[in-house]
Amino acid sequence: TGQKMWISNAGFAKLFIVFARIEDDKNITGFIVPNESNNGITLGDEEKKLGIHSSSTRQVFFNETKVPVENMLSRRGSGFKIAVNSLNVGRIKLAAACLDAQKRVTSYAVQYASERIQFNTKIIDFEAIKEKVAIMATDTYVGESATYRAAKDIEDRIKIRHDSGNSFQESELKGVEEYAIECSLLKVAISEDMQNIADEGIQVFGGMGFSAETPMESAWRDCRIGRIYEGTNEINRMLSVGMLIKKAMKGHIDFINPATKVADELMGIPSFEVPDLTELFAQEKLILTNLKKIFLMLAGAGIKKFGDKLEEHQQMLLAVSDILIEIYMTESALLRTEKNCNRLGKETQTNQIAMTQLYLYKAVDIIQSKGKEVIVSFSSGDEQKGLLMGLKRFTKYYEYPNVIELKNIIAEKLKEENKYCF
């Protein structure tokens, strides 16, 4: 007996997966419940939503609904674990779904900009529009790189567990669970990229973008739920850092030793030698390594300062999570682009190289901003000066990329193909 809100597909579902508490059990249990009106099940009216109008969303009311014991999903009291794992799967699936929408919206924007003429010039030839479509494409490429990476990691982990004698079901559960952090990071990054891309798509369309007759209006409304689905982005941000710290505390990953090495490095004299940057991505790899040091520096200092009460400092966790997101997304794009350069030849990957370099440049800006925010929040005096100097050292470029040129390169390829083409 009870009610559930915001149930997707409730209007036509034949079966419900319901999580409920049996009597005074501490933990919840999962059930398979047929949607039968003669068994105490009634539905509320269809919700009037901001977006996703074609989906059915209703309340479900249970009034002394009888559920046979054989309809229990797994074991009694194991519902929370099932629910959490379904969220992990849902998060990476949401990321993949958003990516398809990002590609379509980017293509719509490029096609409209190639047709719309202002001052006797197609607006795709204006640098203000080139910048927009280049960033839209870059965020899509990077998000896709990270999603493929996580999906392959999960697939490999499932196979390893299955080959070791685990059942396929157990292998899937554990495989996804081991990459729960990555699933959360992807969900946050890509749902927010989707929102930004839809917003910029409207801007490219101008006044027409505000019309319900163009595809941008529904894209903007429909994508807003992505930041709320499968746990809000704020919850997922804090979860990702929290899970990482818990893994370190349990000894599942070595976090303390690398953090200590970074702290020791900060105490030493920095090298002023200019490294050899002739090899492809030499500078990008060096910067990426240093960005990881920033995360270790800040998370290590936070743990040292607050211990197990770090979770209470939510703004700090949110900022550190943003740093973690940028590191994972940047590394994913770099790995993909480098692999394809080696496989297909560097000359075939000009635009992908440009997108990787452009994204890293943006990531460094974000990490500098978030890093300062975190450092100033919990430190003072010499400690603060040391951490800020470390942040400056670890975000150093030896040769700054020409980001305007990078954006123009990407935009010209989009114009040539008249769609998202990467």
Where on the chain are the PLM-derived regions?
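Secondary-structure transition/capping motifs at alpha-helix termini
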Residues: I22-N27, K103, S107, Q111-I124, ...
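Acidic/histidine-rich catalytic neighborhood
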Residues: I129-E177, E182, A189-S191, M208-K250
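A short core secondary-structure module
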Residues: Q3-T42
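Short, solvent-exposed loop/turn segments at the edges of secondary structure
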Residues: G11-A13, D25-K26, S55-T57, L87, ...
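Glycine-rich phosphate/cofactor-binding loops in nucleotide/flavin-utilizing enzymes
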Residues: I197, M208-F281, S379-F422
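C-terminal helix-coil-helix/basic helical segment that borders enzyme active sites and/or dimer interfaces
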Residues: Y141-A189, I202-Q203, G307, M329-Y361, ...
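Active-site beta-strand/loop segments that form the cofactor-binding cradle
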Residues: Q3-M5, N9-G11, V110, S114, ...
